[in-house]
């Protein structure tokens, strides 16, 4: 095939060590794999922005799509091995840039990085090979700093974190276009009801600790076990004579954390208590409570740059989302007629026009992702020499293997309070296969039509402010392992399905965002509630701080308890003004009048029970949109369909044409 030399040009500014690179849909551009992307070289300085250029040989007359990104190209771990690429920012327009070269030589001036067709769309990168350490100081359970020295007991403190790693020799410093080692990065974030702030630098005396504010330090590194992290503590509200006579005014002490301490624990999350040493005498004057999480890249799976929906939401009318499929069948006032979180329940909601079906996912003992709402279930046991053969024992789902979940007689924990336990167990035993609880996530992905969206709630143990834990489980899986298994299952089996993750656990949301670049996540929050007990995590206590957290983590949006939205409807427009998508959930959403109000107020999605009570069997909005597109593109289809599309026409009516639409709503176009 005739070659064409294409010179790609982009303008933009970089941090020291960063490069611009291009990644696209052909071999020469890496086939969307950033590890095989082509780095651009600097041409000249054009004032505020530098021109970057790469000349690449493409096939003439063949259309190619591509995107630009900026990041680091690191030294290979082994001699002759592949280099590692860290993506800091990348272009995520729904339609990538494209070119069809028709000449032997061509120059493509793509203007400013991130701007395509006059629209700027950039997203942060994901973890490719680096590790992220998060250190947090907050008042969720108790004040993070405790001082024993009498004269400081009532003082307020400011904290500054200093990051130390291996020092580089001068010979190791290289130009930004050559492979190099990644320098450690530090970002400081302050999250509250009113705002969030992200900074790469700190004041000389750091930031103040406040009861209503979450302080977080994010460190990205290639050497997670080789860092020294130093907390310096400064007293606030100093008198003038103290300030004038001190080179470090108010500095009272220091606490040191070696990252190897975290690495050796083998845990993805935890709390460390560090001694604070006096500045002068080096005696212990108190302690600091440091909450941490470690986020590792997703192993065994490489995210590509073909598409991303992490921050994309198409403007539409509010979407109907089937809660646990066809609805709550265990704990609400009016129970669903189909058992919740089963394939039958999900299929029922889908057949009644649900745009998405919402369900809960966690792991069995042998690490199989299963769909089930509660963290515990009841195991049926038969007692010897007892006329009543049914005895129920509550057991965590995580203590049973997938095969045991399929074979043992299990029932919902509400059976413990049931007057007729035997009846509930018999009902479980006589269920049809699609009515069986605990289907695997893979089974659900394979069983339902691809044009039904999935809102996958990732279950995790939550602690209440009174100290109680969900299911009385104070320990759970390792968070990295837990999410790696669930995310890989989804990424490898999702096809073209629309997927939105959600979770009540803020750290789960953070990890999902950092581990993959394809699917969005919503932060679930109950806000201020008279129904549910307050949660321990400060980020979960109010809808405003949930918004700030979602902005800070660059999430798609929030999923708010309807009780809180009905009490504070202004939250809806406030969230939208901050660029967030907003869903709602809760029993109040089951009221059709509440749904009408919420839709008028602009909620993007409503999760509710028994969708079959309100909507007839019909295609969902995605199927209708697909059919409308086909009608516009294929005139022959118009004669086969009635003007008002309320459901798909059977393919038999289109017998005279080569075009038909399958009953499941997936278009099947032959010879068109």
Curated annotation (Swiss-Prot):
Its main location: cytoplasm. Residues 1-115 form the CBM20 domain. The modification Phosphotyrosine is found at residue 608. Its EC number is 3.1.4.2. Residues 318-618 form the GP-PDE domain. Keywords: Cytoplasm, Hydrolase, Phosphoprotein. GO terms for biological process: glycerophospholipid catabolic process; skeletal muscle tissue development. It catalyses: sn-glycerol 3-phosphocholine + H2O = sn-glycerol 3-phosphate + choline + H(+). GO terms for molecular function: glycerophosphocholine phosphodiesterase activity; starch binding. Widely expressed, with highest expression in spinal chord. Disulfide bonds: none annotated. Substrate binds at residues 70, 88-89. It comes from the Eukaryota. It is found in: Cytoplasm, Cytosol. May be involved in the negative regulation of skeletal muscle differentiation, independently of its glycerophosphocholine phosphodiesterase activity. PANTHER family: GLYCEROPHOSPHOCHOLINE PHOSPHODIESTERASE GPCPD1 (PTHR22958:SF1), GLYCEROPHOSPHORYL DIESTER PHOSPHODIESTERASE (PTHR22958). This is Glycerophosphocholine phosphodiesterase GPCPD1. It comes from Homo sapiens. The gene is GPCPD1.
């Amino acid at each position: 095939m005739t070659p064409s030399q294409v010179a790609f040009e982009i303008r933009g500014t970089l941090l020291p060590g960063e490069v611009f690179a291009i990644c696209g849909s052909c071999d020469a551009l890496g086939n969307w794999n950033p590890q095989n992307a082509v780095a651009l070289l600097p041409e000249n300085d054009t004032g505020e922005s530098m021109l970057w250029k790469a000349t690449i040989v493409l096939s003439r007359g063949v259309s190619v799509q591509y995107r630009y990104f900026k990041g680091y190209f690191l030294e290979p771990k082994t001699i002759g091995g592949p280099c590692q690429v860290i993506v800091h920012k990348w272009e995520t327009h729904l339609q990538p840039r494209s070119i069809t070269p028709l000449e032997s030589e061509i120059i493509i001036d793509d203007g400013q990085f991130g701007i395509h067709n006059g629209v700027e769309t950039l997203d942060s990168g994901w973890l490719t090979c680096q590790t992220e350490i998060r250190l947090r100081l907050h008042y969720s359970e108790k004040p993070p700093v405790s001082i024993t020295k009498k004269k400081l007991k009532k003082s307020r403190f400011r904290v500054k974190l200093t990051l130390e790693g291996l020092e580089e020799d001068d010979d190791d410093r290289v130009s930004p276009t050559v492979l190099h080692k990644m320098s450690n990065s530090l970002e400081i974030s302050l999250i509250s009801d009113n705002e969030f702030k992200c900074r790469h630098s700190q004041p000389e005396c750091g930031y103040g600790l406040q009861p209503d504010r979450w302080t977080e330090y994010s460190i990205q590194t290639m050497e997670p076990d080789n860092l020294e992290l130093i907390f310096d503590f400064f007293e606030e509200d100093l008198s003038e004579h103290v300030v004038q006579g001190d080179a470090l005014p108010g500095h009272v002490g220091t606490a040191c954390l070696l990252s190897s301490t975290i690495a050796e624990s083998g845990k993805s999350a935890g709390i460390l208590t560090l001694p604070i040493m006096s500045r002068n005498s080096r005696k212990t004057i108190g302690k600091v409570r440091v909450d941490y999480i470690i986020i590792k890249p997703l192993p065994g799976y490489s995210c590509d740059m073909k598409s991303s929906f992490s921050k994309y939401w198409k403007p539409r009318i509010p979407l109907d989302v089937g809660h646990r499929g066809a609805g709550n069948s265990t704990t609400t006032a009016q129970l669903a007629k189909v058992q919740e979180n089963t394939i039958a329940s999900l299929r029922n909601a889908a057949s009644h026009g649900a745009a998405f079906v919402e369900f809960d996912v966690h792991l069995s003992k042998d690490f199989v992702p299963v769909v089930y709402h509660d963290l515990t279930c009841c195991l049926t046991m038969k007692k010897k020499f007892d006329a009543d053969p049914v005895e129920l024992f509550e057991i965590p789902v995580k203590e049973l293997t997938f095969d045991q979940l399929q074979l043992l007689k299990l029932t919902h924990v509400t059976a413990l309070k049931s007057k007729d336990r035997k009846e509930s167990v018999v009902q479980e035993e006589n269920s049809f296969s699609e009515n069986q609880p605990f289907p695997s996530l893979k089974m659900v992905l394979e069983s339902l039509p691809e044009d039904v969206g999935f809102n996958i709630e990732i279950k995790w143990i939550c602690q209440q402010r009174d100290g109680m834990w969900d299911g009385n489980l104070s320990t759970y899986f390792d968070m990295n392992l837990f999410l790696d298994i669930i995310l890989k299952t989804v990424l490898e089996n999702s096809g073209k399905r629309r997927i939105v993750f959600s979770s009540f656990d803020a750290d789960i949301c953070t990890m999902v965002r950092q581990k993959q670049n394809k699917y969005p996540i919503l932060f679930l929050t109950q806000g201020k509630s008279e129904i549910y007990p307050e949660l321990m995590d400060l980020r979960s206590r109010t809808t405003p701080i949930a918004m700030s957290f979602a902005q800070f983590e660059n999430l798609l949006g929030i999923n708010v308890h309807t009780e809180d939205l009905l009490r504070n409807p202004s939250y809806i427009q406030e969230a939208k003004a901050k660029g967030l998508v907003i869903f709602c959930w809760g029993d109040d959403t089951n009221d059709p009048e509440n749904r009408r109000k919420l839709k008028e107020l602009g909620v993007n999605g409503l999760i509710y029970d028994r969708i079959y009570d309100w909507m007839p069997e019909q295609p969902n909005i995605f199927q209708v949109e697909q059919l409308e597109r086909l009608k516009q593109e294929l005139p022959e289809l118009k004669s086969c369909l009635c003007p008002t599309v309320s459901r798909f026409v059977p393919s038999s009516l289109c017998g005279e044409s080569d075009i038909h639409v399958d009953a499941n709503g997936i278009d099947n176009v032959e010879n068109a």
